[in-house]
Amino acid sequence: MNHTKFQTSRIHRMLLPLTCTLLPAAAAQAAEAPGQKNAAGDRPNVLIIHCDQLGAWALGCYGGTQIETPNIDHLAAEGVVMTNFYANTPVSTPSRGCFLSGLYPNEHGAFKNDKQIRQDIPTFASELRDAGYTTGYFGKWHLDGNPKRPGWDIRGKDMGWSDRTSMYSFGHYKTIEAQPGTHPKFEKSVAASAENYPTDWFTDRAIAFIEEHKDERFCAMLSIPDPHGPYQVRPPYDTMYPPRQVELPATLTEEPRNDHFFYNETRNKIDRRSGKSEYDLILRNIRRDKSAYLGEIKCIDDNVGRIISYLKQAGLYDRTIIVFTADHGDMMGEHARMAKAVPLEASARIPFIVRYPKLIPAGSHSEHVASCIDFYPTILELTGTRQHGQVSGHSLARVLEGRSDRWDDAAFLRCYASVYPWVGIVTPEYKLIYGEKDPNGKALLIDRRKDPGELYNCFDDPAYSRVIRELTERIVRYCREHNDPHGEWLEKRIR
């Protein structure tokens, strides 16, 4: 498919009636337009909306209050929200590899940014394609290793995606060249319009793909490269949330009751003792970045509304499994940190929303702990697709459908990409993280029920000695079973 600038304008004109207003909750209840009979029969279509660096904390359906996200929240109200869903590694490449392959980072090969995913493993997309689905990917890929420059040229295998003409290798653009086959221009200035801003542009590509294949079984993955930095967004979103009105997190200046690396690494930078001018500058920068970050999310939400409107108009809304998620979050000032790569909630906990009324009860919430590796087997079971690949994740289908409450309730997290490698476990009650360079051998233990702000390190508290021992054994067992190299230094440490 040859996407030209002319075609981009035409698609926007075609979709203009769908973009004039937000999708209110009342409109979302409207009946679907009668569509043509789906030649694929009863098996559902699949649409995955996958964002980059979108923390669960920002969305209304996850308790966020700083922006309104009515369209994403509407998907949540009509489906199920996983409140404890985690990135196995809160960094782009390894997390995307986990989501695609159902394997841990050291198993799928892309264990840090700029590492290519193994080319010999199946993916949920290849399984669906083999089962008769037409598959298409639109947006940022970031699983192709370290090409010399960003662009539309993907070197590796298609990994199950038949249409990847609008898949680009890596990077974050604010203006997209509407001509795959050339290298898109990287513009940091906010000169983009709704016709060439990435969130809008890739949404157009996904809608066009679905329109072309609406009488087939399809799986479309819309990989939106926002709200990742550079924190800039097109008008009118760039002025919706003035920096002076942006709320700063309480943990930004509140002193943690511990001395762990994850807090102390940047704490001195935000300490008033460092000088008022520097302190004020840091706060201004955080407000500026968060202002744009919230605008980027609002733009995403509006585009989710466009997709919902199109699916309803095409008679596909109730015949499509819709998944909304992200690769990792963004600290955005929490604990005086920005970006990701740490196991704290703002970085590691991500949204995971699934809507499919035929199987999933509306308005459901699940507090079970799960992670990206669980998506592969889950989507195959939900679509009735036989699984051939060997994965480390487990299917959440019965949990999402409300048919079973049995679940292991643990997520294993690890990170190799940062200057501070770490590995750990999250359960409903606790989070235990070991870092290779922990000061004085002191790990991080959070009592999640008592301390949702993650301000207290309970590792030295004798009352938690049994918890620490049991969770440590589980981490060691995970490392052994999955050949995670973090286990080498961890076992030496705890001997």
Place the predicted regions along the sequence by residue:
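Residues forming the ATP-binding cleft of Hanks-type serine/threonine protein kinase domains
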Residues: 449
